[in-house]
Amino acid sequence: MIDYELKQRIDEVKKRYEDIVKVFHPEDKKKELEELEKLMGESDFWNDQKRAKEISQNAQRIRKIIDDMVDIENKLEDLEAGLELLEEDATFLDTIKQLIDDIERKVKTFELELILNEKFDSSNAYLSIHPGAGGTESQDWASMLLRMYMRWAERRGFDVQIVDYQPGEEAGIKSAMLYIKGEYVYGYLKYERGVHRLVRISPFDANKRRHTSFASVNVMPEIEDDIDVEINPEDLRIDTYRASGAGGQYVNKTESAVRITHIPTGIVVTCQTERSQLQNKETAMKVLKARLYQLELEKRQKQLEEIQGELKDISWGNQIRSYVFQPYTMVKDHRTNVETGNIDAVMDGDIDIFIESELIFFAKSKNKK
């Protein structure tokens, strides 16, 4: 006999999977996969490399989702069989609990994979951080956020590299940019864009007063080479300088740093990570391409949320998330209302609770429109 709480979990995970089936229509997707596989089998399929790549990637994604659904359905069948055996043998209870844990985990992962279906969700990402007004305190907060996102990427097994790092005068950073490489990095991070607020007793205040600081986070997808972004070399001013800052093993400190200014738009990008000017220039050009593509999308679309939401002033009232160290400890996302008191874990990169809730929240918001 199972208890009420366990029965609730079983009913809930079944309903979540039924909701997925209603949205996804697996039989229709199986037919779509068959059509794509027919196209891929044609003799002239690879004549158009760009089209072939898009079709292959789409087929691969649909095939994975279908396989995942079959796996979940098989485990649900195992669960039903296990529940029948449980009526005769109570020792099956631990097996049932483990099976429910496994199904819940797979359904949750599957829900997120279905949500991450927009154009750039599977891309690598550039994440930049800028402190708001407040001098050293805000600059220190920006460096804390930098570490948080680096730890998150490392926890996830993603490759992370500091592309640009401008140190603060006393502590912290004036700005920094990360390049994070891995599957669905941009999709996971895209809603982290916005203003992040810190409340703490400042270590830089001799009177030990409580301070509120702000820093902004921007996230851009890496733009692949097959996406056309026209950059006229005559529109560029390229400067070189010595890299600076305490970026540890992530930052190069030779005379190879590169700054590229796109004169028509005033966009400035810098890179100081690589070991040569040529490599830094190549990386900076990739960042510039992403910035220009982002700018073009913003011109075309009134709803900036289509790619990354609206970045507001770095000030009170515009924050997406608050991190409170004193007089109590709490991290709260003001969009989803998700919160936790374990601020040390959050600052050490444990932010999936916020990322996952953001994805579900905004997916539901879009479905209502």
Curated annotation (Swiss-Prot):
PROSITE patterns linked: RF_PROK_I
Compartment(s): Cytoplasm
Entry keyword Protein biosynthesis: yes
Disulfide bridges in this chain: none
Protein keywords: Cytoplasm, Methylation, Protein biosynthesis
Pfam families: PCRF, RF-1
Family annotation (InterPro entries): PCRF, Pep_chain_release_fac_I, Pep_chain_release_fac_I_sf, PrfB
HAMAP family tied to this protein: Rel_fac_2 (MF_00094)
Physiological role: Peptide chain release factor 2 directs the termination of translation in response to the peptide chain termination codons UGA and UAA.
Family named by the database record: Belongs to the prokaryotic/mitochondrial release factor family.
Protein name in UniProt: Peptide chain release factor 2
Organism: Thermosipho melanesiensis (strain DSM 12029 / CIP 104789 / BI429)
Organism classification: Bacteria, Thermotogati, Thermotogota, Thermotogae, Thermotogales
